[in-house]
């Protein structure tokens, strides 16, 4: 048996901030018995409460099970659990390949996944193929809710409805696959409403959560606590802006954050981040151009810090696409500057609102 204590987790695993998705095996894990062999299977004790609690904490869940798809879905429907599992991988592929597919579909890093299985072979195969993933033996299911990595500091409104927001994303993706036309033509059908506002005290829990959860679309990787963000919010030398997005399928929630350090002659973007769920919606460009417009109106230079890592290449491209140029390198960090000569208009298909 592999225990949490016995795993020789690499540094990334030890330092990871939170689990975004728990992936369940089924036979002798989620339920007692083997579905295709036993006359009946029964849910593991307290499993429904565990699933509900993880869901309420904003931790997504999925399945990686070697089973017959139709039979398995029917059984999950009998138990009333189907709706809790996003992109379930029920097939005869390796567990590692199923986990890779789930990470790709959810657009999250492999190190944001925990995998639960009762079979030592399956756990070892995943550990070898995907060492970033946290592997948990089914015998330790009772301890999961007490693990720090499964306990976000705050449970926000966005946390509580995260699964529902992902379900809306699936509807959008299906609609996009079926749409005949250009990307812009499809985006125009969404009736997007994008709002940027000065962060209020009630936004800070979600703002902290964004800095902790967002790795791919984060320009510096900086994380800030609730108290630090509250200090920035009240500071005359900083602007803390938060962005939200909704469309005809529903709300994406609060999906973007910008921290600007304001000096008399120059502003510096210390942090720009957005949820991976809105990567293809063009809102990063709108956020940047809004800040550029503010800097122009205040007659200040606009700088931006960027700290590259193995995930945030897209944010580097976003800066370059918006006309930012490298003016300085300091160790691993890059300083960009924008001359504010080509501020792009908000696309006609987005209703844009600014709330001071």
Where are the model-predicted features located?
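Acyl-donor binding region in acyl/amide transferases
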Residues: 245, 254-329
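Short, contiguous acidic/charged loop-to-helix segments that flank catalytic cores in large enzymes
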Residues: 35-45, 90-92, 199, 217-221, ...
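Substrate-recognition element of Asp-dependent hydrolases with the DxDx(T/V) motif
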Residues: 47-77, 88-93, 206, 220-224, ...
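Short amphipathic alpha-helix that is part of the acyltransferase structural core
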Residues: 191-223
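Non-catalytic pre-domain segments flanking phosphatase-related domains
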Residues: 1-24
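Conserved Lys-Pro-Asp/Glu-containing loop-to-beta segment of HAD-superfamily phosphomonoesterases
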Residues: 99-120, 126
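Asp-based phosphoryl-transfer active-site loop
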Residues: 19-35
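Terminal substrate-recognition subdomain of acyl/acetyltransferases
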Residues: 105, 127, 133-190, 293-356
């Amino acid at each position: 048996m592999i225990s949490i204590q016995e795993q020789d987790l690499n540094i990334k695993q030890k330092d990871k901030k939170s689990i975004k998705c728990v992936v369940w095996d089924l036979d002798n894990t989620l339920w007692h018995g083997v579905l295709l062999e036993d006359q009946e299977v029964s849910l593991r004790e307290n499993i429904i409460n565990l699933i509900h609690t993880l869901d309420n904490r904003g931790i997504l869940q999925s399945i990686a099970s070697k089973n017959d798809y139709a039979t398995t879905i029917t059984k999950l429907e009998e138990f009333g659990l189907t709706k809790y599992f996003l992109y379930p991988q029920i097939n005869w592929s390796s567990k590692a390949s199923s986990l890779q597919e789930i990470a790709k579909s959810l657009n999250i890093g492999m190190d944001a996944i925990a995998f639960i299985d009762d079979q030592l072979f399956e756990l070892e195969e995943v550990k070898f193929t995907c060492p970033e993933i946290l592997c948990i033996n089914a015998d330790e299911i009772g301890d999961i809710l007490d693990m720090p990595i499964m306990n976000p500091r705050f449970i926000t409104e966005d946390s509580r409805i995260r699964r529902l927001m992902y379900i809306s994303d699936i509807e959008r993706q299906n609609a996009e696959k079926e749409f005949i036309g250009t990307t812009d033509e499809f985006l125009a059908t969404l009736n997007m409403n994008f709002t940027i506002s000065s962060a209020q005290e009630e936004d800070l829990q979600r703002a902290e959560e964004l800095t902790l959860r967002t790795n791919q679309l984060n320009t510096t990787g900086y994380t800030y606590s609730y108290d630090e963000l509250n200090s920035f919010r009240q500071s005359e030398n900083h602007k803390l802006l938060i962005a939200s997005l909704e469309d005809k399928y529903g709300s994406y929630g609060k999906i973007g954050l910008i921290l600007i350090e304001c000096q008399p002659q120059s502003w510096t973007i210390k942090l720009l981040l957005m949820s991976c769920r809105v990567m293809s919606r063009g809102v990063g460009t709108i956020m940047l151009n809004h800040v550029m417009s503010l800097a122009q109106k205040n007659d200040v230079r606009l700088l931006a810090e960027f700290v590259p890592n193995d995930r945030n290449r897209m944010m580097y491209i976003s800066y370059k696409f918006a006309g930012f140029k490298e003016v300085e390198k300091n160790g691993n960090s890059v300083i960009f500057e924008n001359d504010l000569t080509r501020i792009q208009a908000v696309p006609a298909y987005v209703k844009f609102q600014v709330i001071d």
